[in-house]
């Protein structure tokens, strides 16, 4: 389907459930895609939207055959569940120059084939369930600007290794719960909050390295089989002793 000149918006639920659409070519004048516009358009494979600035809630949710999404530097808003349930989506490219500040809640929830994500440099928050059950997502570049990772943001993701940015301040509850391929994690020195169950269920996680004392540490942040590397006599060390976690010292 080609959307020609003269259109600036695709209306709410405009093509919801349309199973005949296969390729979407939106004219550069189209600035906004409203809620549920292409919800459950199960035959759509490709989209081209060079001028879009706003993608509203559930706009492409349930497009189970969609394979890729390239979002330009004009992108300002991408609301929750925008691409949730797009099970064949393998690649998402958000322009490095995009002004978007947050990956909203559940944006890519259960995109189980997603294996490549490019984030804008200015992202400060990854929302709740943003990459929930993205089981093929083995690597992820965390922008230096990132301050918060939300609850269950990467629940059961396929991450094999992560490098958390130095200025990260909060890891939410169950943020990396059941990331079963993770083997090592270093917590940055500016982190203030580690939510409960943050790295619990990461069965291969051998070492969680924490060289400082966060202000708040939740319960069961790792499995008992994981060693927590910290400074002897620190508050982190006491937390480990009180909760029965194995320790290694710097």
Question: What is the role of each PLM region?
Answer:
Residues 61, 96, 109, 132, ...:
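A structural signal for leucine-rich repeat
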Residues 106, 152, 197, 220, ...:
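Intrinsically disordered, low-complexity segments
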Residues 11-14, 34-37, 56-59, 79-82, ...:
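Consensus positions within tandem repeat domains that build extended binding/scaffold surfaces
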Residues 82-85, 243-247:
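Contiguous hydrophobic segments
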Residues 1-9, 19-32, 42-54, 64-77, ...:
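Structural signature of tandem-repeat unit edges
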Residues 16, 37-38, 85, 218:
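A generic structural signal for ordered alpha-helices
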């Amino acid at each position: 389907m080609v959307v020609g000149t003269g259109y600036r918006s695709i209306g709410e639920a405009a093509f919801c459930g349309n199973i005949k659409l296969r390729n979407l070519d939106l004219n550069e004048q189209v600035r906004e895609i409203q809620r549920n516009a292409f919800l459950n358009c199960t035959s759509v494979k490709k989209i081209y939207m060079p001028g879009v600035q706003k993608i509203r809630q559930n706009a492409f949710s349930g497009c189970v055959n969609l394979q890729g999404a390239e979002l330009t530097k004009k992108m300002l808003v991408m609301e929750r569940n925008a691409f949730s349930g797009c099970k064949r989506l393998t690649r998402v490219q958000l322009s490095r120059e995009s002004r978007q500040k947050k990956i909203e809640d559940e944006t890519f929830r259960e995109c189980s084939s997603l294996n490549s994500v490019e984030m804008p440099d200015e992202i400060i928050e990854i929302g709740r369930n943003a990459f929930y059950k993205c089981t093929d997502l083995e690597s992820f570049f965390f922008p230096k600007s990132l301050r918060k990772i939300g609850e269950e943001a990467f629940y059961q993701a396929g991450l094999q290794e992560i490098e958390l940015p130095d200025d990260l301040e909060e890891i939410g509850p169950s943020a990396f719960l059941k990331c079963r391929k993770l083997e090592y994690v270093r917590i940055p020195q500016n982190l203030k909050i580690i939510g409960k169950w943050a790295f619990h269920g990461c069965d291969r996680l051998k070492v969680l390295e924490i060289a400082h004392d966060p202000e708040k540490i939740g319960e069961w942040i790792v499995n008992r089989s994981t060693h927590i590397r910290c400074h002897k006599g620190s508050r982190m060390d006491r937390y480990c002793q009180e909760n029965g976690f194995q320790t290694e010292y710097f």
